[in-house]
Amino acid sequence: MGTVIAYDCLKRVPDCPKIDGLLTIGSPLGLEEIQQKMTPEWTRANGFPSDKLSGSWINVYDALDPVAGFDPKISNDYLKTLLPVIEDIHEPNFGMWRHDITKYLAGQKLRTRLRGLLDL
């Protein structure tokens, strides 16, 4: 639920500092049950937290992740003035428990995007 808390802060906490980039990993933010709890601040048409996020939002998921897998792609749920701006990256994990940060961090796609976000 860390990504839900981070998003909630970006949208609802006035004193939340601005950030240059956001990386969500195995996030349940695509689930309608989560989105319903974020209204009225969240809308599909303008869900991107552009007041607090000045750079990229990269969402990494595994389709078999039990937390994110039911709706892992969030670029269509958090638009910026009706346009998709989030980059959804499918990073296949392995093993029985796919919602494991060590498995995500072992993925080449995630590491490549993270280096880009950090300007390394």
Q: Where are these predicted regions, by residue range?
A:
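Lipid deacylating catalytic domains
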Residues: T3-L120
